[in-house]
């Protein structure tokens, strides 16, 4: 007869063994890939499918919830309804919850039966939503991996500076850029509003040299650039959008050097010793001019510059004479205090080692960019009491197609070796309280070199992801660079943003159309690097200016406005192939493009490649003459190649709208190469 106790005990042991075996086979979720890398992850088992409901526990988070819902729908095509009540399975919950260990930007996410995002501040919850969206876009239909995230940044300021003075950057791009920065938890965008090109490329005449001031100005009518500028209204709206996404905008008016836009407007302000790109600091009118200019954007109940900080410039002024150095220091101190009188924190380029002197310069609550140890030694500036922002030129400066600094940042080196504690040849202690954070910069030094906003973004995006990681996660990254670099490419730029023009995977056909009729609207705005666009054309006579395709950013011409050739226009530059569409002939054309060139193939054979083109300066001192002079010697007018612009002829191919052409276009095929 069986013993009931023994049977029960055996059943219990068997059940325990089964449970243990199951536990051995169960997988705890690994840390999700996010940029910047998550600080802490406690994995659990299983996945959570989202319900499509979003519960907000505080009215202060209403705006964050609306942004999350909008972004989620843009990325997935599914609605996220903001509702009240108790959470149900799969709901997303946003809540404010005090926690001193998380600071101002830290947050927690608990992915369990539902998904709860908590932080002490709205900014922290905003960053939590960015993490959630990144994880969700990689979920591949499995749901969100269960686990607990605890995350906060190593450094308070994580940013980027873009030079809009030498090249006009459309406000539409700046708005998208703010969204991209937010998606990667970059919280500071500095907009460099004025600057000038190199005089040597403009006939060595200051009056002809490119300059730009990119903001509407009532105080000085005519100061605003005519080749592209921002109205006050659109600049304010841009800042408001950035605020919604957790990004501070720092407007920069750079002076007392880099001021050619101001001295071309009012020549008497220019230095006679150091060139028109320098103010004459001994001229009282300089201070009246700058006081009034700053007041226009900082004064009033609703100032144009909305954020807590503004940048007063102060880089690269001459230190040739002691009296000039002292005057420069006086200027710097004056405008630190002047912008503070409007309630703003002053930010400036470090120059006080270069301009070492006796005139005191305010240091309390002043942010200084550490861009060059020769101009401002970080160790000395720390002793002085400045708050430091690491933006070392030898690591973090992009100057597109210039031949110096970086065309693309060395992201592998930055990922493996750099943090904001590394300020060039001087390295401070990691997380030193004097270090506010780190940034990188795009300087459009070579005005007129054909670089497009798309080219700038192609350089910016990988750098932004990497600098974001190193400012947030610091030395605590766990992935190799190869792993990180492969995975980061799978992430979107931001919800609803596709400045790179990515349409599909490599070596895939992403769009086909048997016949393209005049005025047709296509499903894609554009295709970015690397691509091939192929079509068959039965040519007809086309008027100059006849378009094939157009987007918001570019136009491809069947017959360009000047010569009637196949060509393209973007960013104010017109480039043409040495090819006219033959009337009454049928050919297959392919346009291939990458970040270095645009190539035309006719019937499968390369016709022409538009790559970087050197455009040389012709100067009398560069004239070549190797002949022995005599009465009957004729000397050719030829010049040694010396300084030149590397002119870029790239194209992100427009696709949105077909033009009004006479030719017949068939068999359109758009490929990712």
Feature locations, PLM:
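Extracellular glycan-recognition modules
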Residues: 508-569, 659-661, 665, 670-673
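Active-site neighborhood of glycoside hydrolase catalytic domains
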Residues: 262, 267-366, 371-380, 384
